[in-house]
């Protein structure tokens, strides 16, 4: 069984390895097989699946991506609630980001946003990923739209007090995307 606290600690400390990722996937798959039969899921199973996918994303362990994508898609089919569903969509978006397959990045990113369970930090990250996907495909008008959404989320974030929206990087990105529209 994947221990969420231990998993998060390994990822943060930088000792997370490809073998750790494969071990987590194997453990999650075994637990999935048992839970899908009984329809009883442990409370933090979705977090364990999410943080496993986050570790794969953060470390770009490409060889682990497809087994984890397959597991997340199975989990969506048996998803016990929408909060868990949101985590699986976010996991899939990040896994597809590792592969560079932009249509799926946008698809799962938007599904995550539509669940209504998106938190601010992940919402900003999701919009940023969508901006990158559209920019990579020369869809600058769409990229600008989601960049503005990302800025709105940050602007309305009480924890982001003191954020300067007029710094060089933000202005350059807006001007660049706007000039391509």
Where are these regions (language model features)?
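Small side chains
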Residues: 21, 48-49, 55, 72, ...
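Helix-turn-helix repeat elements of alpha-solenoid scaffolds
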Residues: 14-30, 58-71, 97-110, 145-148
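Acidic, Ser/Thr-rich low-complexity linear motifs
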Residues: 121, 157-170
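TPR/TPR-like (Sel1-like) alpha-helical repeat modules
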Residues: 141-158
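Alpha-helical adaptor scaffolds
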Residues: 52-61, 80-103, 107-118
């Amino acid at each position: 069984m994947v221990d969420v606290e231990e998993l998060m600690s390994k990822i943060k400390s930088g000792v997370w390895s490809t073998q750790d990722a494969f071990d987590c996937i194997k453990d999650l798959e075994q637990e999935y097989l048992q839970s899908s039969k009984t329809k009883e899921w442990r409370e933090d199973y979705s977090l364990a699946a999410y943080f496993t996918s986050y570790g794969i994303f953060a470390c770009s362990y490409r060889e682990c991506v497809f087994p984890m994508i397959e597991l997340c898609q199975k989990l969506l089919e048996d998803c016990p609630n929408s909060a868990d569903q949101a985590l699986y969509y976010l996991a899939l978006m990040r896994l597809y980001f590792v592969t560079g397959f932009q249509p799926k990045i946008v698809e799962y990113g938007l599904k995550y946003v539509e669940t209504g369970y998106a938190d601010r930090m992940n919402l900003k990250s999701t919009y940023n990923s969508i901006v990158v996907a559209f920019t990579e495909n020369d869809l600058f008008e769409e990229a600008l739209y989601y960049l503005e959404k990302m800025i709105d989320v940050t602007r309305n974030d009480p924890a982001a007090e003191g954020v300067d929206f007029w710094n060089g990087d933000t202005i350059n990105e807006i001007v660049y995307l706007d000039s391509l529209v």
